[in-house]
Amino acid sequence: MNKEFIKSIVVSSPWEKVEIARHKDRPTGKYYIDNIFKDFIEFHGDRLFGDDKAIIGGIASFEDISVTVIAITKGANTNENIERNFGMPNPEGYRKALRLMKQAEKFNRPVICFIDTPGAFCGVGAEERGQGSAIANNLFELSRLKTPIISIVIGEGGSGGALALTVADKILMLENAVYSILSPEGFASILWKDSKRVKEAANVMKITAQDLNEFGIIDTVIKEPRGGAHKNPQKQVTLIKKEIMNAMNEMKNIETNQMINERYDKFRKIGTLE
């Protein structure tokens, strides 16, 4: 068996998982919306500035249940990546997402989020329009939203840009996804002044689904087809649907105040030492 074939089916090191999470053919958030949900109707705009195409959101049906679905999505090709700003949302994207979540709360619809972003966009315009406050406001409002929230990290989960949609009751991750405060490249450059030490950085950062599940930061690791989700996207769809259904069943009989208290406790426990 040649080395390239072995590499294509065996992913073990954290850095290999980073590479798989960033793979150009990895299914996008839009792909999962189109293939997991029925009757999706997309909503646009934050009612303050404009529409951010890095975040897609709207209402849909999941197994005959009305849901609000939101995705931070990259593009499936170069042109679409440019249109979607390579999955880096502007503040109007986060405000749009929050608008849809508050609507979901009003109509008692569960919220399902898909996350795949290297981080929030850090351009001058984004800062001028309040990127920091948009993310902070999402964290605050999601912590007390009176409807179930399920978030799934499907690729990269980068920094506050990802966290803005992952203050959730259930956090799921694909087994080759990563979720961290910054990229391994950024970590190596800042801490060691050497961007070439990315593999070492990925090892010490504990960014994999398996590590984060062990620490209690995420709830479920979703298996991927051998070699990654891009090897068999339809099989990945089936695996994700099953875990979404499991998460919804676990939450369907929880009273609202209990749900909010458990969500609060979940995040307060992160980082505590026994």
From Swiss-Prot:
GO BP terms: fatty acid biosynthetic process; malonyl-CoA biosynthetic process
CoA carboxyltransferase C-terminal domain span: 2-250
EC number from the UniProt entry: 2.1.3.15
InterPro entries in the cross-refs: Acetyl_CoA_COase_a_su, ClpP/crotonase-like_dom_sf, COA_CT_C
SUPFAM superfamilies per record: ClpP/crotonase (SSF52096)
PROSITE patterns on file: COA_CT_CTER (PS50989)
Superkingdom of this protein's organism: Bacteria
UniProt entry keywords in alphabetical sequence: ATP-binding, Cytoplasm, Fatty acid biosynthesis, Fatty acid metabolism, Lipid biosynthesis, Lipid metabolism, Nucleotide-binding, Transferase
Protein's cellular compartments: Cytoplasm
Gene Ontology cellular component annotations, sorted alphabetically: acetyl-CoA carboxylase complex
NCBIfam families associated with the record: accA, AccA_sub, PRK05724.1
Job description of the protein: Component of the acetyl coenzyme A carboxylase (ACC) complex. First, biotin carboxylase catalyzes the carboxylation of biotin on its carrier protein (BCCP) and then the CO(2) group is transferred by the carboxyltransferase to acetyl-CoA to form malonyl-CoA.
Family (UniProt): Belongs to the AccA family.
Subunit structure: Acetyl-CoA carboxylase is a heterohexamer composed of biotin carboxyl carrier protein (AccB), biotin carboxylase (AccC) and two subunits each of ACCase subunit alpha (AccA) and ACCase subunit beta (AccD).
Protein name according to UniProt: Acetyl-coenzyme A carboxylase carboxyl transferase subunit alpha
Lineage, broadest ranks: Bacteria, Bacillati, Bacillota, Clostridia, Eubacteriales
